[in-house]
């Protein structure tokens, strides 16, 4: 077994395996355990009572957090030439048509998000093997297939992003950086929790949340009481 570092041992002593009902106390502890030599991301890990092999128990949606997540997103837009100006003026970092498809097919994925107009989707079908594993395939559900590029780009530039439950029914998602203010992290986390709650799959029976943990990129997990947001 790998020996824990001094920093890790000190952080484990801080959390004391307590389940926190106070969001403010949990966020304070979260920031106190952000002791790495870089600015750590902060994460929510929500274990949900869902079985994602059933269509009515899948969770995949988008959210815009009040204070973003501290990351600038590089956005590519795949559309026809008639929409190039709108995409460029909307703040797209890459705009293209067939030439962008060719780049993607060669594995050039120098973007964090791909937005496409509906007319380009048939041409993207053959690139599912390239884009799918990276989570970059545009879809109407994620808001990345759109005819209104101006609005779509504005939303994503403001921090809108997609999240989903994995095969085990757990949502792993960043909600900011450890150097955000306590209030910013509390507001972001509350908004994220509310988004998960509001998008509860129709097939869920009984309680929805099984457990909630927050942590920094390199820090220990801090458990939240399931009634923290009530």
Swiss-Prot record:
GO terms for molecular function: rRNA binding; structural constituent of ribosome. InterPro entries: Ribosom_uL1_bac-type, Ribosomal_uL1, Ribosomal_uL1-like, Ribosomal_uL1/biogenesis, Ribosomal_uL1_3-a/b-sand, Ribosomal_uL1_CS. Pfam families: Ribosomal_L1. Keywords: Chloroplast, Plastid, Ribonucleoprotein, Ribosomal protein, RNA-binding, rRNA-binding. The keyword Chloroplast applies. Its main location: plastid. The keyword Thylakoid does not apply. One of its GO terms (cellular component) is large ribosomal subunit. Gene3D superfamilies: 3.30.190.20, 3.40.50.790. It is found in: Plastid, Chloroplast. It comes from the Eukaryota. CDD domains: Ribosomal_L1. One of its GO terms (biological process) is translation. Belongs to the universal ribosomal protein uL1 family. PANTHER family: 54S RIBOSOMAL PROTEIN L1, MITOCHONDRIAL, LARGE RIBOSOMAL SUBUNIT PROTEIN UL1M. Part of the 50S ribosomal subunit. Binds directly to 23S rRNA. Might be involved in E site tRNA release (Potential). This is Large ribosomal subunit protein uL1c.
């Amino acid at each position: 077994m790998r020996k824990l570092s001094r920093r890790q041992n000190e952080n484990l002593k801080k959390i004391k395996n307590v389940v926190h009902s106070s969001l403010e106390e949990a966020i304070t502890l979260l920031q106190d355990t952000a002791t790495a030599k870089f600015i750590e991301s902060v994460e929510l890990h929500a274990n949900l009572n869902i079985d994602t092999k059933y269509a009515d128990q899948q969770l995949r949606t988008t959210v815009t957090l009040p204070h973003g997540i501290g990351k600038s997103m590089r956005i590519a837009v795949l559309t026809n030439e008639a929409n190039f100006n709108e995409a460029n003026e909307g703040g797209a970092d890459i705009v293209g048509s067939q030439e962008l498809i060719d780049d993607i097919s060669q594995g050039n994925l120098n973007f964090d998000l791909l937005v496409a107009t509906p007319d380009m989707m048939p041409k993207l079908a053959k690139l599912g093997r390239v884009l799918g594993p990276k989570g970059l395939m545009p879809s109407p559900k994620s808001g990345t297939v759109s005819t209104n590029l101006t609005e779509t780009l504005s939303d994503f530039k403001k921090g809108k992003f997609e999240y989903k439950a994995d095969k085990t029914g757990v949502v792993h998602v960043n909600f900011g950086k450890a150097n955000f203010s306590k209030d910013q992290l509390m507001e972001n986390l509350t908004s994220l929790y509310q988004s998960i709650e509001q998008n509860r799959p129709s097939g869920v029976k009984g309680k929805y949340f099984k457990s909630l943990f927050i942590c920094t990129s390199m820090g220990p997990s801090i458990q939240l009481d399931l009634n923290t947001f009530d």
